Design a protein with these regions (language model features):
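Phosphate-binding glycine-rich loops and their immediate beta-loop-alpha structural context
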Residues: 97, 101-104
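Small/polar loops that bind or transfer phosphate-bearing groups
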Residues: 24, 99, 158
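The feature marks the mature, well-folded catalytic cores of soluble enzymes
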Residues: 1-89
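Generic hydrophobic, helix-prone segments enriched in Leu/Val/Ile
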Residues: 43, 94-96
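Ferredoxin-type iron-sulfur electron-transfer modules in oxidoreductases and energy-metabolism complexes
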Residues: 67-94, 109-171
């Protein structure tokens, strides 16, 4: 398990409790440690311009006999929340999103209204595509229109997610 934070506060939540429970969405799972380190480098460069986030924590599971600290018990809960329904659809590329925020930083709508205006956990162009997939277009019908379709989000996306195309599809 790899955790990246902006303050290093997650490390304490991983080593102090006797039980460590990780809750992550399905798209956060990658096949190899090499894949994870590649994503970490891309994430830091796209989010903050750093080579690597200062606060990156690797957790290998429960404490072993030779370990000085760490949890006695370790559990991983993978959330779907509608994500597998995106597989095989025009929105499947959205599952590659690493939540770096590059699309938000370059979106003129996001710059004008901020993140809270989206009304959900995910904001900006990526949120305007992902949220309707997770909660349905009836409830999130306004989000795909929160874009000028200028394409800046796709230009800066390190995962090359075609956000404008997906926003047009929702519209």
């Amino acid at each position: 398990i790899v955790t990246v934070t902006n303050e290093g506060n997650a490390e304490l939540t991983q080593i102090l409790p006797d039980t460590h429970i990780v809750i992550a969405s399905l798209e956060k799972v990658v096949p190899t440690l090499e894949d994870a380190t590649t994503i970490l480098r891309v994430l830091a460069r796209s989010a903050t311009g750093q080579d690597m986030s200062v606060y990156t924590t690797f957790c290998t599971g429960p404490k072993r006999a030779q370990d000085l600290d760490g949890p006695e018990d370790f559990h991983v809960v993978l959330l779907d929340n509608g994500r597998t329904k995106m597989l095989g659809t025009e929105f499947h590329d959205m599952l590659r999103c690493i939540r770096c925020g590059a699309c938000l930083n370059h979106c003129p709508i996001y710059k004008a209204v901020g993140g809270h205006a989206y009304g959900w956990v995910y904001s900006g162009p990526m949120g305007a595509v992902l949220i309707p997939n997770l909660i349905g277009l009836d409830e999130a019908h306004h989000l795909p229109n929160a874009s000028t379709l200028c394409g800046k989000c796709e230009e800066v996306c390190p995962m090359r997610i075609p956000l404008p195309r997906m926003l047009r599809s929702w519209r």
